[in-house]
Amino acid sequence: MSARVLVADDSSTMRKIIIRSLQAVGVPEAVEASDGNEAVNLFQPGKFDMVLTDWNMPGKSGLEVIQSIRSQDPNVPIIMITTEAEKSRVLQAIQAGVSDYLVKPFTADTLREKLEKHGCG
């Protein structure tokens, strides 16, 4: 798998877990963003094959990250990875333009399924 993934999460521990999970499923390159503002600044259309973002981050929230990225690239897959599992939150993310939703904690196999579902596997 040669996908390039942008990983946005304010927890350095969570970013490491996500990146290890990506490596375990064959994603060789992940770029880290420690908050929503950094994620938006790093994103450029065509630079990433997928974006993984947390919901609650300083600066821009995951929803704001999704909206900003969607305004630049309506087709890049964006997966929200969060502890927010309530239906209303999932609906908010869908309305913002998220491609998929993954609740923490997750397994590498579940992440692989999401990547494959969105053409990054």
Question: Where do the protein language model's features map onto the residues?
Answer:
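Receiver (REC) domain active-site loop signature in two-component systems and cognate sites
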Residues: M57
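Conserved acidic segment of CheY-like receiver
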Residues: A3-T13, I18-L22, V51
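Short hydrophobic/Thr-rich beta-strand motif most characteristic of the beta2 strand and flanking loop
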Residues: V27-S34, L42
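Active-site beta3 strand of CheY-like receiver
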Residues: G46-L52
